[in-house]
């Protein structure tokens, strides 16, 4: 059920940054470290490679009963039976995506303002990804979003909000009391030598309320 999705530690992949030989290894280690949700994001991969990667990664997420979200590529999400799709403001409109994937799939939408977040909720998004909260090398064109704006978005929408953008073990503590449901992380997990322990550390920092 979509209402029971755990967004706490949301892994976003990037095969160019991973420290392992395969995406499957990276994803499995991240899940072992506590990642609760996985998004396959491969902006430079060919359609064939993306499709194959999605099949391979889904074998891992299915094994551990962790939802798999596909970034942008609705066709691939449907082809492999992924749990949902995440789209940005420059991708296919979220309302159109919802019509294509139906109501049973998870729909995540990126938003950098209160207005965009409210709009995303109205068209049927299940969660909102807000960022970039910190400087990030994985999305150099991302506009910065302040912690203040993040908290305003949390107050204005009733669906889960996930923080994204440059989140790591040093700054994750700043997000603990913002009201967000989870943190989405790329390089601070997938590019680390010990992916499992890196995920465990981030989870401990974010979840620990001390």
UniProtKB/Swiss-Prot annotation:
Condenses 4-methyl-5-(beta-hydroxyethyl)thiazole monophosphate (THZ-P) and 2-methyl-4-amino-5-hydroxymethyl pyrimidine pyrophosphate (HMP-PP) to form thiamine monophosphate (TMP). It catalyses: 2-[(2R,5Z)-2-carboxy-4-methylthiazol-5(2H)-ylidene]ethyl phosphate + 4-amino-2-methyl-5-(diphosphooxymethyl)pyrimidine + 2 H(+) = thiamine phosphate + CO2 + diphosphate; 2-(2-carboxy-4-methylthiazol-5-yl)ethyl phosphate + 4-amino-2-methyl-5-(diphosphooxymethyl)pyrimidine + 2 H(+) = thiamine phosphate + CO2 + diphosphate; 4-methyl-5-(2-phosphooxyethyl)-thiazole + 4-amino-2-methyl-5-(diphosphooxymethyl)pyrimidine + H(+) = thiamine phosphate + diphosphate. Signal peptide: none annotated. Its cofactor is Mg(2+). Mg(2+) binds at residues 72, 91. Belongs to the thiamine-phosphate synthase family. Its EC number is 2.5.1.3. PANTHER family: THIAMINE BIOSYNTHETIC BIFUNCTIONAL ENZYME, THIAMINE-PHOSPHATE PYROPHOSPHORYLASE. Binds 1 Mg(2+) ion per subunit. One of its GO terms (molecular function) is thiamine-phosphate diphosphorylase activity. This is Thiamine-phosphate synthase. It is an enzyme of class 2 (transferase). NCBIfam families: thiE. It comes from the Bacteria. 4-amino-2-methyl-5-(diphosphooxymethyl)pyrimidine binds at residues 39-43, 71, 110, 139. The lineage of its organism: Bacteria, Bacillati, Bacillota, Clostridia, Eubacteriales. The keyword Transferase applies. Gene3D superfamilies: Aldolase class I (3.20.20.70). 2-[(2R,5Z)-2-carboxy-4-methylthiazol-5(2H)-ylidene]ethyl phosphate binds at residues 136-138, 166, 186-187. Pfam families: TMP-TENI (PF02581).
